[in-house]
Amino acid sequence: MCSGGIMKIRYAKKSEKEIAIKFWKDSFKDSEEQIKFYFDNIYNEKNYLVLEDNSKIVSSLHENDYIFNFNNESIKSKYIVGVSSDITMRNKGYMSKLLIAMLENSKKKAMPFVFLTPINPKIYRKFGFEYFSNIEYYNFSVEELANFKLPNNEYSYIEINEKNKNLYLNDLIKIYNSNMKDNFCYLERNNFYFDKILKEASSDEMKAFILYKGKKACAYIIFGLYEENIEIRECLALDNISYKEILALIYGYRDYYKTVNLASPNNSSIEFLFENQLNIEKIVKPFMMMRVLNPLAIFKNLKLENSNIKIYIEDKILKENTGLYSLNNEISFSNITEEKAVYDLKINIADLVFLITGYFSIDDLVKLGKINIKNKNIIKKLNKIFSKKNSYLYEFI
């Protein structure tokens, strides 16, 4: 794959699982339950990329398989987690070599992009990653739920556990999909992925409930009870009434827990379900970063033929991406230098993420100095092509 002298990058052998576990324990603060969950349910040596120096593994990362729904198309991608180096071998450039090898590998596997949740975004920007999705966090007193009523007619709240979960996976998927339909980009969840989410929640000592009204599944909630706080990891419903009804369940814990912290998709405006918005603290944080590996494939996915724009992209890591992309009656690429290229706009590979996912509007990108537009008359046209959009990804591994 990649080797220079005594350095070698490869996927792990079956016998190296213990090494992977040690790396994880040395680098992250996860509990024994969380580590056990990961290595029992998700870890796969075929996705564990390691860098060896003198036959010793000194740096590693995990590439976990996911299917993105990106502009209504199912796309295979990798969620990069557990990026770490041997504590005694840091600052030797191992991590950089490993990340670049991962990007090159993923591109060879025909993946248009990969994604990760950074501990420090500054590190990953150097490799062309940029944010493309936010999460909203709402903090409020449990008493704010006092007016949220239980359903009137025939209803049931069912706690989902290891024994009964298979009965409810399809209904969880239906509620999830109904919430995703307006998102430009989200992770597809089938039975396997929902099962993983429930196991992960359980390893984090969380509970999951689903609300039925009559025979219809209307909402679900995944939450944990910690000290004086109720942490809601995910709460999705078919409509705002069902949303309030599933939150009414949480009010039942009011004698023991004082505050609620609720995570929600971007632009969900949950504060307006409450009577007093000023009592609801809302914090919006960037959550997930993407790295575009193949701009041509993305422009085709976005169906940008006949847009009649020319975009010059600069990629300092995967240099073969640098060049002119012409979105005419067909989408073409030419690796000419910037001096020779005639283009409408210039952008680097990281900021391209903002553009293609609609994280920012064109006007925002101009204000932030993230895009260089040669011809100002084209801004109106660009605003039509690259509109602002929402994405939802709230996975941890």
Segment roles from a protein language model:
Residues S3-S60, N64-D65, N72-Y79, A146-N191, ...:
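Short amphipathic alpha-helix that is part of the acyltransferase structural core
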Residues F68, T117, E130-N147:
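Conserved catalytic-core motifs of GNAT/GCN5-like acyltransferases
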Residues M89, S106-K107, I250:
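Hydrophobic pocket-lining residues that define ligand/cofactor binding sites across diverse proteins
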Residues M89-A101, M111, I241-E245:
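Conserved acetyl-CoA pyrophosphate-binding loop and the N-cap/start of the following alpha-helix
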